[in-house]
Design a protein with these regions (language model features):
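Interfacial segments of alpha-helical transmembrane regions
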Residues: 71-77, 147-181, 188-205, 209-212, ...
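Intramembrane catalytic core of multi-pass membrane enzymes that act on lipidic substrates
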Residues: 66-141, 145-148
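Membrane-interfacial catalytic/cofactor-binding modules of polytopic membrane enzymes
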Residues: 181-285
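Short, hydrophobic transmembrane alpha-helix segments
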Residues: 31-44, 58-67
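Aromatic-anchored segments of alpha-helical transmembrane domains
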Residues: 26-35, 79-85, 172-180, 297-308
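N-terminal membrane topogenic signal
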Residues: 2-23
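Structural signal for the C-terminal ends of transmembrane alpha-helices
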Residues: 55-65, 151-158, 283-287, 329-334
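Membrane-embedded catalytic cores of phosphoryl/pyrophosphoryl-handling enzymes
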Residues: 244-344
Length: 344
């Protein structure tokens, strides 16, 4: 009977391998079908579900690794829940929303000009050019790339994965705390509201939900003095319109729906900018040198996208970069302290 044990073990491994391949194939079919019928998984909760179920399928037959998926990926869930709850946190705390400070800061930085207004005056066309496809995709990568990086690291090196999770969760939670105590309106909202509309610092005045067309003097943001032929002569929120060239109207509708349901006054700091530079900095020494220009370009294109499409002020982006640098430095110091403490 003993000589048969290896054969039995080998047969069991073959069965588990077949089961794993079938599970992965089924996962691929489900994801492709849902993508084709309902659009890309821009909803972060759904994306996290896709990743976790895919990792579970790929872990069949590998001991306790399936359980590790649930244990290891739990830290991401509180971040998503906290972000959803942050919408009303500032109201509960009683903090007024900042409407004027970022506009004034950008004007001071750029000698009286507001970069969002300046860029839309000179670049916005009546119909989205090809490069708006690029910036729409770069903007949406914020909701996808960190989770994909985490999934790859989890499969390749769990120590690296743990280091990345510390950066992701740490940066996200600090930003969420700041959103609760310092709510701030983005440029697209400032273009829709006048000083009278936002007396007292409301978080969700009615002016935020109307078009910027016809708002006196361009609202708090200031009026566009010129525009390209045929383009609207007011500042618009245009981050998703690039997908119109690809007929991805479902994706645009999903993003618009998602934008309407999240915290609309979470502008300072820009988590888009902060997390982008944090991911780039984390990968900088972990990728071949030839990829580093792409990481740097990614950070800069994201910054341009956020300003041009009226998602963030420049000062929001600078503060996002600063927060990322502080979090990375604190984590590095903490890890160095742990290593020294372990050797002691």
């Amino acid at each position: 009977m003993l000589p048969r044990a290896p054969e039995a073990g080998s047969a069991r491994e073959r069965r588990l391998t077949i089961a794993r391949r079938i599970a992965v194939a089924a996962w691929v079919v489900v994801v492709v079908y849902r993508t084709a019928t309902t659009g890309f998984a821009f909803n972060r909760e759904l994306l996290l579900l896709y990743i976790c179920t895919g990792l579970i399928a790929a872990s069949i037959g590998q001991g306790r690794r399936m359980l590790y998926v649930i244990r290891d990926w739990l830290p991401f869930a509180p971040v998503l829940v906290a972000y959803d709850f942050s919408r009303g946190a500032a109201t509960l705390i009683g903090r007024p929303t900042m409407w004027h400070w970022q506009v004034d800061a950008d004007r001071w930085l750029f000698f009286g000009n507001v970069p969002t207004v300046w860029l839309q005056e000179r670049l916005k066309l009546p119909h989205p050019p090809w490069w708006e496809i690029v910036i729409s995709s770069v903007y949406m990568s914020f909701f996808i790339l960190p989770y994909v990086v985490a999934a790859v690291l989890w499969l390749r090196d769990r120590n690296e994965w743990k280091a990345f999770v510390r950066v992701f969760v740490g940066l996200s939670f600090v930003a969420l705390v700041i959103y609760a105590i310092l709510p701030a309106a983005p440029p697209w909202a400032a273009a829709r509201c006048t000083a009278r509309d936002v007396v007292g610092g409301p978080a969700g005045p009615a002016c935020m939900f109307r078009p910027a067309r016809g708002v006196p003097d361009g609202g708090l943001l200031g009026a566009m003095q010129t525009s390209r032929d045929g383009a609207n002569n007011w500042v618009e929120r245009i981050v998703t319109r690039g997908w119109g060239n690809l007929n991805l109207h479902t994706a645009s509708a999903l993003v618009d729906q998602g934008q309407a349901s999240v915290n609309l006054v979470a502008a300072i700091p820009s988590l888009h900018a902060g997390l982008t530079v944090a991911v780039a900095a984390f990968l900088w020494t972990r990728v071949a040198r030839k990829w580093r220009p792409f990481l740097a370009s990614y950070v800069l294109i994201m910054a341009f996208t956020l300003v041009y499409t009226a998602e963030h002020f420049v000062v929001d982006i600078l503060l996002g970069w600063l927060l990322a640098a502080v979090v990375l430095l604190v984590i590095r110091c903490f890890e160095s302290w742990r290593r020294r403490d372990g050797r002691a």
